[in-house]
Amino acid sequence: SIPDKWNDGEDDQDKEYIKLTYFDLALRKWVTQAIVVENGKETVTQTGHTPEQDPEPVVKVELNRKKLSSLTVKFKYSIRITNQGDIAGYAKEITDYVPEGLKFVAEDNKGWTDEGNNVISTKLLENKLLQPGESAYVEVTLTWINGKDNLGLKTNIAEISEDYNDKGAHDIDSTPDNKVPEEDDQDDAPVLISISTGEARIYYALGFAVLITIAGGIILIKKFVL
């Protein structure tokens, strides 16, 4: 062997390869259903949205003013946690920030806890070990606070608020429970509530619409990009 000179085959040199691994949990949230109840009759509209839509189209519900007092409107959301890294780990807690104008009803949300101040949380996935590439799902339902002045855009936000892996690795591109919208452990889902003048209006500009007649009242579930 010749010191300080690289010659293949000499025994005074060797190579060592290191594989870098990382921990990365990502969250996606989207509206799956718009639910309208009038006098005990429930009508469910599937939005057809998927977690890959970014940004997600707004789900619009247009209500007949004359029927307003007899209506209950709910929105069902799905939350997907995906392990995008190389290290298996857990989403120990998910926190959801309920927007003004919507409310959390415990009876609709088994496994969720009301933390107060329009914040709810769940540990439904705390014991679910997510292997690299694996996903797990939870759902949450929020109810519109009925009122002619409670209209407009309502944006619901969810975030991974606690994670864990047995390597002690931090998420490579997110910090749990820090409310930073640019990070991939947080996502939002928008809905829009409006009042009609009595006649149904269907807009064709962007997206598509589904028209539903409920006991004489007209409700427009419209999905479009702002």
What are the residue ranges of the model-derived segments?
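A surface/secretory-pathway sequence property marking extracellular, secreted
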Residues: T32, K41-V44, G48-H49, Y90-P132
